[in-house]
């Protein structure tokens, strides 16, 4: 849900390895162009060090506190986002925008040095889903998260996936 919320707000998701050192986190933040961080409470110390190194203000850190986890003193819970009001999510329904709009920046394992960023578009994720999960071919082409339905016959963006 977090990834979809980030995309819906017009952002680009990136995730890190919880065992990263502050230096590795700093590299990840710079390479991914991260502006905000949502972190588990257990790894706040290396996150703070990387944020200081990369110039991300502490006000841009939210703690992902679920179940019985607590937010460290002086920090904000990710749940503060719920009090920010509501806005419609970013939408587009054309193939070109889907192919050119970044959805995530994922990283290689870094076998020859530090991990390298790879930008995946919305179209990349749709293609991956089609390859993995859509064994039976649909009678229509899917090219975005919003697509006309075969039953509508109007070519309008009337059904969300």
Where on the chain are the PLM-derived regions?
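Structural core segment of the AMP-binding/adenylate-forming
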Residues: 8-84
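Conserved pre-ATP/AMP-binding loop-to-beta segment of ANL
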Residues: 76, 80-107, 114, 137-143
């Amino acid at each position: 849900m977090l990834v979809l919320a980030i995309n819906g707000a017009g952002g680009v998701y990136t995730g890190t390895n919880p065992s990263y050192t502050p230096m590795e986190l700093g590299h990840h933040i710079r390479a991914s162009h991260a502006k905000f961080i949502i972190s588990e409470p257990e790894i706040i110390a290396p996150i703070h060090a990387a944020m200081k190194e990369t110039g991300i203000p502490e006000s841009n850190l939210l703690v992902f506190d679920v179940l019985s986890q607590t937010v460290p003193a002086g920090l904000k819970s990710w749940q503060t986002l719920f009090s920010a009001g509501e806005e419609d999510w970013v939408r587009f329904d054309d193939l070109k925008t889907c192919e050119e709009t970044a959805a995530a920046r994922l990283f290689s394992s870094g076998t020859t040095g530090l991990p390298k960023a790879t930008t995946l578009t919305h179209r990349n994720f749709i293609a991956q889903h089609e390859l993995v999960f859509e064994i039976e071919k649909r009678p229509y082409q899917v090219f975005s998260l919003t697509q006309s339905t075969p039953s509508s016959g109007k070519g309008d963006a009337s059904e969300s996936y």
